[in-house]
Amino acid sequence: MGKRILVQRRGRGGSQFRSPSWKRDGPVRYPPLGVISGKGYVVDILHEPGLNAPVAKIVTENGVEFFNYAAEGLYVGQVVEIGKGASPKTGNIMILGEIPEGTMIFNVEKRAGDGGKFARAGGTYAVVIGQKPEENKTIIRLPSGRTVEVDSRGRATVGIVAGGGRIEKPFLKAGKKYHRARAKAWKYPTVRGKAMSPYAHPHGGGSHQKGGTPVPKTAPPGQKVGFIGSRCTGRGCVRARAQQKQ
């Protein structure tokens, strides 16, 4: 008798597939608009399991407490300026429309009050490249190189997210990778369906492993696994598409 395959178990949402929310200190986002302004104090810099950058715990003058990604060079006890009139110094949270061109920023709000959407990974930053005051828009260049327009009334933090160079250090051991995946609720290791027995996966079985064929889009539920209706897959596919564009 067959058994439920991994993607079906993941879809059910068992505890081993859920992110361990009890390990989190809190959401890393700005408070709603109008709640914070003036000055805040960095009371602690925390290691957050599941995130790839240190998190700064900030308390404002009126007692509001929130979490933001720590900038490179930020330290406990530092005073950060928040909101209108803040100066473009590392760690300060500024209004996008007041940030000078060429400034490096992170945790950028796409819409005013959404808490921050862009440039949040360790070592990343966006750059302000222009302002459109008449349209309330700020033009920024994202870490990917793409240029976007965001609401000038939104907020961003000046500087670069701490934790850069993280991906340059190799894992060396499978156990290290296991613990990283466990912190993020990733399933590790991943096993190919072709390597399984026939009771465990529709692609399993056979005396020898052979290259499979894509599952057609007209296949019934339960047979639709892996790459469905794909023309090509893998690194060669990406290379071929790039050559076609040229």
UniProtKB/Swiss-Prot annotation:
| Name of this protein | Large ribosomal subunit protein uL2
Biological-process GO terms, alphabetical: cytoplasmic translation
Role this protein plays: One of the primary rRNA binding proteins. Required for association of the 30S and 50S subunits to form the 70S ribosome, for tRNA binding and peptide bond formation. It has been suggested to have peptidyltransferase activity; this is somewhat controversial. Makes several contacts with the 16S rRNA in the 70S ribosome.
Q: Which UniProt keywords apply?
A: Ribonucleoprotein, Ribosomal protein, RNA-binding, rRNA-binding
Keyword Chloroplast tagged: no
What terms describe the molecular function in GO for this protein? RNA binding; rRNA binding; structural constituent of ribosome
**Protein source organism:** Pyrobaculum aerophilum (strain ATCC 51768 / DSM 7523 / JCM 9630 / CIP 104966 / NBRC 100827 / IM2)
Name one matching Pfam family: Ribosomal_L2_C
Family statement drawn from the similarity comment of this UniProt entry = Belongs to the universal ribosomal protein uL2 family.
Residues forming coiled coils:
none
